[in-house]
Amino acid sequence: MKSMKRRLALLVVLAVVLGAAPASAQGLTASASGYPSGVLAADATRYMALGDSIAAGYQAVPVTKGYVYRLYNTETFDSIDHTLFCNASVPGATSSDVLMHQVPQALIRSVDGGFNAKYVTLTVGGNDLLAILHYIQTNPDPSTVVPFATQVITQYGRNLGAILFQLRMGLPGAKVFVANQYAIPEIEALVPLAGPMIAFFNDVVNQVVGQFPTNVYLVDVHAAFLGGRKLVLGELPGVSPFETHPTNKGYQVMAKAFAEVIDANR
């Protein structure tokens, strides 16, 4: 009991001390700390990346060559010293994972310490598509493949719609930039359904994004990759054709595609 009273007394003293501290001690200014003033400013630009391994910069060397980091480093949204950046993406994430886990974190309220992004980039769906590829490789009955693929991509469309709806409601001032899926010729050569499957997927992305008349924008990564060489790791000698992540060059192309749409819709 005495120990509990001591702890309570310490908490009261701490609260009084913190409450009495001058504002300059609670939030250092650039002149006092030597730290760039822009990131301490109330109006600092806030950029959040959501998605899967591609948004995470997986297998980029170094990882900061991933498209998300390139957007930050090239000051696509604002100068670096006036930009707060949060990469919430996770390798392996499906559209369901983004909807259930990343979106709620993106919507944490400012009063609770939330990020309150002004710009959001989203790259998700590759792992949804890989589930179809796995099904094709393991299911002996080809007549079930198209229904399964249709089901997966249709559910992806529902998830994407819910992701964008929740972001629009929870962050009404934020602008959201959504990538579609680039072609993977090495897989398409081995799995004839892969090309039509990606085309259907991109149609769904286009339709869902089109349902939001403001602050949601399509980034046509598919078009940006067309005709390019060595943009995907599976194209490189000695690498499995089923390696679907971009090369550093591919990430650069993605960053350029995003930057063009962002610049046009600031």
Language-model features: where?
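Oxyanion-hole/transition-state-stabilizing segment in secreted/luminal serine hydrolases
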Residues: D97-T154, A183-I184
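Short amphipathic alpha-helices and their capping/turn segments at secondary-structure boundaries
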Residues: S33-D43, L99-A117, A162-G173
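Catalytic His-Asp segment of secreted/periplasmic serine-dependent ester chemistry enzymes
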Residues: Q181-R266
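Bacterial N-terminal signal peptides that target proteins for export
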Residues: K2-L10
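Structural recognition of the beta-strand scaffold that forms the well-ordered cores
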Residues: R46-G51, A55-A56, L84-S89, K118-T123, ...
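A structural motif corresponding to the C-terminal end of an alpha-helix
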Residues: D78-S79, A162-K175, V204-V219
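Bacterial N-terminal signal peptides
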Residues: L11-G19
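Serine-esterase "nucleophile elbow" of acetyl-processing enzymes
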Residues: G27-S89
